[in-house]
Amino acid sequence: MSATGPISNYYVDSLISHDNEDLLASRFPATGAHPAAARPSGLVPDCSDFPSCSFAPKPAVFSTSWAPVPSQSSVVYHPYGPQPHLGADTRYMRTWLEPLSGAVSFPSFPAGGRHYALKPDAYPGRRADCGPGEGRSYPDYMYGSPGELRDRAPQTLPSPEADALAGSKHKEEKADLDPSNPVANWIHARSTRKKRCPYTKYQTLELEKEFLFNMYLTRDRRYEVARVLNLTERQVKIWFQNRRMKMKKMNKEKTDKEQS
């Protein structure tokens, strides 16, 4: 049995005898239920003979008074509050937002709320033809439903950094080829033949005229023709060789037709 309040009469009577009531009354003060018992004068000494003591006040350790710390302004920290429920057809924005000084307002948000908009494009010069104004306008911001943004194809702008990166990757792939691997060499093999340099119509016409006069050229004449046509001696020599082979083939076909 436990009692949270003052000791009840029943609990005291069951534990102690009535012979010690005077002793208990002098030790325990009376509660509101019982009248206050007067303490005997012998227990309290008389201090009227001693003079009263007076102490000099000590200087305060801290000169300034203790004041509560001022609360932080609401500008620094904004506690999260429940936002109003938006409908299914309400427009939404991306997560990388920046605050604007009232540039665009939304009817779904409270009047005192902060307005947000998407960051501007990283290439502002490409939007020079959008409008005459230099400030931000509604075409500069992108709004749309999730379905519209999902269906919209991403636009990639070519940049010199991307081209340089692609070229470096291509070079690394070439360097990774093993020269001892015949399969890789066969796949990436290139012809050692020089790039074909076709003759112009004027050069071909002059060479044909020279071929009609003489099927074989001397070294001096070949040098002169090459200088006039802005060609090398080797190019003139090869052209005459090919032209003689072509003429020989044409004569052989003509002879075969006559015999048949």
UniProtKB/Swiss-Prot annotation:
Protein family according to the UniProt entry: Belongs to the Abd-B homeobox family.
GO molecular function: DNA-binding transcription factor activity; DNA-binding transcription factor activity, RNA polymerase II-specific; RNA polymerase II cis-regulatory region sequence-specific DNA binding; sequence-specific double-stranded DNA binding
Portion annotated as DNA-binding: 192-251
Cystine residue pairs: none
Phosphoserine: residues bearing it: 159
Compartment annotation: Nucleus
PANTHER family referenced in this protein's UniProt entry, alphabetically: AGAP004664-PA (PTHR45970), HOMEOBOX PROTEIN HOX-C9 (PTHR45970:SF1)
Subunit (UniProt): Interacts with Geminin/GMNN, which inhibits transcriptional activity.
Keyword Nucleus: yes
Record's function text: Sequence-specific transcription factor which is part of a developmental regulatory system that provides cells with specific positional identities on the anterior-posterior axis.
Main localization of the protein described in the UniProt heading: nucleus
InterPro entries registered for this protein in UniProt: Abd-B_homeobox_TF (IPR050803), HD (IPR001356), HD_metazoa (IPR020479), Homeobox_CS (IPR017970), Homeodomain-like_sf (IPR009057), Hox9_activation_N (IPR006711), HXA9/HXB9/HXC9 (IPR017112)
GO CC terms in record: aggresome; chromatin; nucleoplasm; nucleus; transcription repressor complex
Biological process annotations from GO: anterior/posterior pattern specification; DNA-templated transcription; embryonic skeletal system morphogenesis; negative regulation of cell cycle; proximal/distal pattern formation; regulation of transcription by RNA polymerase II
A Pfam family assignment: Homeodomain
Protein name: Homeobox protein Hox-C9
SUPFAM superfamilies in alphabetical order: Homeodomain-like
Region (Disordered): 120-181
